[in-house]
Design a protein with these regions (language model features):
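N-lobe entry segment of adenylate-forming
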Residues: 1-54, 433, 477-487
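Conserved pre-ATP/AMP-binding loop-to-beta segment of ANL
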Residues: 5-6, 140-162, 169, 178, ...
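Conserved AMP-binding/adenylate-forming
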Residues: 49-93, 383
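AMP-binding/adenylate-forming
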Residues: 103-114, 158, 171-255, 264, ...
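Gly/Ser/Thr-rich phosphate-binding loop
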Residues: 241-244, 252-308, 319
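Conserved ATP/PPi-binding loop(s) of AMP-dependent carboxylate-activating enzymes
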Residues: 310-314, 323-351, 372, 382-384
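AMP-binding/adenylate-forming catalytic core of the ANL superfamily
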Residues: 331, 359-443
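Conserved C-terminal "lid"/linker of ANL adenylate-forming enzymes
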Residues: 377, 403-409, 417-421, 431-487
Length: 487
């Protein structure tokens, strides 16, 4: 990886030819348009000028709301170059959450790419048109001023990324540029991602995994591909690397539409069947999986997928230990803190360890993540870790998402309920019948519900707290008595 002394896009622009010809570096493929690093850097400078004219400074905190697009990517880079702390937001985040959250994060400006209004205290920004990658966008004197503005500082705060909020209101995790780049270094070493490769921006920028793709691209001078409105097989054209969930890879293989250029995938979001990775590897696609979290700027541990439940070993720059069954992490990818009320709140103990609240163990040469310490509940004296039930559910080929939460029960204290998102090819009854023999009696859900649209928040992870509240509101009160069905 390069040693950066300037903004990454400027660094790579200084290293590569201005025009794009066969076999020369391409920075960005947006649909079918190819951008050189020079053209990309000029477009970023143009947007920096546009945003600074609207009052964005190095002291600003800017919320950036929208789905993945070339406009979203350029805005992200330009706001970083302005020196602002950039907070990418899920466009499906409820208004009530946004209105409660943004004032506490001292958000000064907001750029919305989906026309939703901002709370009154947030000054809305407009976006200049993204020009085609040719010609000069700024006069020479303005371009020179852009270059003379804020200088690259790797240890400066760059981004605020919301946690999933799975147990309540999301927290804003603050990362420096250096932390993002260190996170990228571990993954690109593992997956042999280099300047001659390309990665599809398949995950949202409001999630740390989506930003991880961007920083791997910036760290290596490779190509990023943005095709947000195309089917997956079309979007993957020209891509050597991709971040996928198992159901996406299954479809590419089963429909025989796996792109020829694809050579490595980072899998997440569900259990990964060995049969899937064996098929992919037979087609020349290496499969990787692991364990990541927002506070560690994405991936903390990883390995070549092998059908076993472990998550491998810590990547370069990360350390891991186990204390009272809890996973603790530290390293160069760790966030600077949680951002609230205009300041950083520490997230580590006196020795620099972050307490994840994840249960874990080390066995057979790798780490295993057993679930959240605060998710466990008891039913008739038996401890239930909902992630264990979810893991079995997610091995069903037609289960796309699953969340298991407790409901109160007079006799047993609590019982599990499953909320699942299914493909149209199966039913809740069929999934229940399939699951029953695979679980102990106390683990079997007493009810199954289809995941409602309002809980599909567009993120990588469902909010367990929201699912729990929704189930509590609809679960029959009679089922909380001794006559509860399904026992």
């Amino acid at each position: 990886m390069a040693i950066l002394t300037d903004w990454p896009w400027r660094h790579w622009a200084s290293q590569t030819p201005q025009s794009i010809s066969l076999n020369e570096p391409v920075a960005l493929i947006a649909d079918e348009t190819r951008w050189s690093w020079q053209a990309l850097a000029r477009q970023v400078d143009c947007l920096v000028h546009h945003f600074t004219q609207q009052g964005v400074t190095a002291d600003s905190t800017v919320a950036l709301r929208g789905k993945n697009s070339v406009q979203m990517l350029f805005s992200y880079l330009a706001l970083l170059q302005c020196g602002a702390r950039v907070l990418p937001l899920n466009p499906q985040l409820p208004d009530a959450v946004t209105e409660a959250l943004l004032p506490s994060l001292s958000v000064t400006h907001g750029l919305c790419l989906n026309d939703n209004p901002w709370p009154n205290a947030v000054r809305p920004l407009s976006l200049a048109p993204i020009s085609l990658p040719s010609g000069s966008l700024l006069s020479d004197d303005i371009e020179e001023r852009c270059r003379a503005d804020l200088r690259w500082q790797a240890d400066r705060l760059a981004t605020l990324t919301l946690t999933s909020g799975s147990s309540g209101m999301p927290k804003a995790v603050a990362h420096t540029f250096a932390a993002h780049l260190s996170s990228a270094e571990g993954v690109v070493r593992m997956m042999a991602f280099s300047a001659s490769d390309s990665w599809l921006l398949s995950l949202p920028l409001f999630h740390v995994s989506g930003q991880g793709i961007v920083w791997r691209w910036l760290a290596t001078g490779a190509t990023i591909v943005v095709r947000a409105h195309q089917p997956l097989d079309s979007a993957l054209r020209d891509c050597t690397h991709a971040s996928l969930v198992p159901t996406q890879l299954w479809r590419l293989l089963s429909e025989d539409i796996l792109p020829a250029a694809l050579k490595a995938v980072l899998l997440g979001g569900a259990m990964i069947p060995q049969a899937l990775t064996q098929q992919a590897e037979a087609r020349g696609v290496s499969c990787w999986c692991g364990y990541g979290l927002t506070e560690l700027a994405s991936t903390a541990c990883a390995k070549r997928a092998d059908g076993r439940s472990g998550v491998g070993l810590p990547l370069h720059g990360r350390e891991i230990r186990l204390v009272d069954d809890e996973i603790l992490l530290r390293g160069s990818t760790l966030a600077a803190g949680y951002w609230r009320d205009g300041k950083l709140i520490p997230l580590v103990d006196d020795d620099g360890w972050f307490h994840t609240r994840d249960r874990g163990r080390f066995a057979e040469g790798e780490w295993h993540i057993l679930g959240r310490l605060d998710n466990q509940f008891f039913s008739g004296g038996e401890g239930i870790q909902p992630e264990n039930i979810e893991a079995v559910l997610l091995t069903h080929p037609d289960v796309q998402q699953a969340c298991v939460v407790p409901v109160e029960d007079v006799e047993f204290g609590h019982r599990p309920v499953a909320v699942v998102e299914l493909a149209q090819t199966t039913t809740l009854d069929a999934v229940r019948d399939w699951l029953q023999p695979q679980l102990a009696g106390f683990q079997r859900p007493v009810a199954y519900y289809a995941l409602p649209t309002e809980l599909k928040n567009g993120g990588i992870k469902l909010s367990r707290q929201q699912v729990k509240s929704w189930v509590k509101a609809i679960y029959p009160s009679s089922n909380r008595s001794l006559s509860a069905a399904g026992r």
